[in-house]
Structure formats: structure tokens, C-alpha cells
Amino acid sequence: GIRALWNHIIDVSVSDLKKNYAALNVEFDLWKGESDVQDIIPGMVEKMKNDGYAHESEGALVVDVKEETDTKEVPPCMILKSDGASLYNTTDLATIVDRMEKYQPDKLIYMTDKRQDLYFEQVFRCARKTGLVKPETQLIHIGFGTMNGKDGKPFKTREGGVMRLENLIREINEEMYRKIAENREMEKEEAEETSKVVALSAVKYGDLSNQASKDYIFDIDRFTSFEGDTGPYILYTIVRIKSILKKYNEQSGGDN
């Protein structure tokens, strides 16, 4: 049925995500989705209504979150649509309830696209106003910039579609393999393994070397270069240093 298909889609999606994260040596302690907090939503919404925080506006259920000190408009936080369906706001608020009950954190940090600043301001204000968190609990949104192509626009494929992470990793792996195979004499298998390691440094350093909140240009040619401020150059430098130290120890008899 529909639920079985839905569960299958989730399994395939999570499996694909884990594969991509594994390629970047990234691990998570917990994997939680929106569906994990669906059971919390009805009680949370009912409490907001009973406490007088949630009210109807044009058929939808909302919580007003504007404050007198606001210098710009902050729209109400919508809890349910006019047809009774929940939204991202709803599940994010339910997730806060879940985390507070299970972990009692002093601080919750959300890292997403900086264009979601207003959204999280609404959600955080709603969580505070309705008592989902203690007054001293810190709710923080850290917004990061977008990765753009050479034209300054969001990074896309040659065909103009959205660049998937796995495709980006593959393209960089292929470019690193090409450069290593052209300039160094080594077996094909060794070149492939080396290119994967160096490509990973190109991706990570290329991203992390920029200020997180700023948009930046992801230039595959530049980031895979063995010259300049790049991940491959740093690895090359480390290898050179180790080679020098090894030769020194060999010539000095390993005394130092």
C-alpha cells in the first residue's frame, strides 16, 4: 500500500544519504526524520490552543510571534494549514518538544541555508512563547551561504539541473584521477585510491576554507589544483615534509 511505498522511499533515501556522508567521512549518532515526531503534534497543537496561544487566521491555525522591538515584519508562525495539514514549522516545533523531553539540552543549534533566518526566528519565538523550552534554553540558528558555480549562480550540472552531492564527489574524483594519472607514474589502482583521498581534501577544504555565512564560488579546476590555497596542495606539502624528515632520519642514522 501507500505506507509500504512511503517506508521504501525513506529506506532508499536514508541509504543514499549514508553512502554520500560515508564518502565524506561524516557520521551521525542519530538519524531522525519528521515522521518520528508525528505522534507529538496533536497533543502539542491542542495545548497551544487550550493555553490561548494558537488561533485561527484565514482558516489556518497560527501563533503570533511579533514583538514591539521588531524593526521588520515577522509574520505569525503557522501551525496548521486551513485543511488541517501540518507544516515544517509544526514538525520542527514537535522536534523541539521531543529533544527537550529526551535530552534536556541547554542549547539547540540549527545549521541551514541562511535564507531560512526568518523561518527559524518564527519557530524559536513560537517555542519560547508557548513554553516548549525553558527560558534559559538557547535556540540558535547558524546560517551558511550557498555554493555557486563560476557564473555566481547556484552550482548546477552541465545540463542545468541541481548538482547532487554524489555527482559532485564523482566529478572531483575523476578530475583528481586525471591529474594524478597525467603527472605521476603509478599503477592504476594506486592512482584511483590516491585520487579519492586527495579529492576528499579538495571538497572539504574548498568548502571549509570559506567564511561559512558567505556565498562562494566552487571552481573544480581551482579546488583540485596542486598549487595555491587548496586541499591537494596542503596534502602535497605534508607528503613533502614527511619525505624530508624520512631522508633526514635515514642519513643521520635515526638519532633524531
Model-inferred region functions:
Residues 10-226, 231, 235-248:
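Alpha-helical recognition segments enriched in aromatics with Gly/Pro capping
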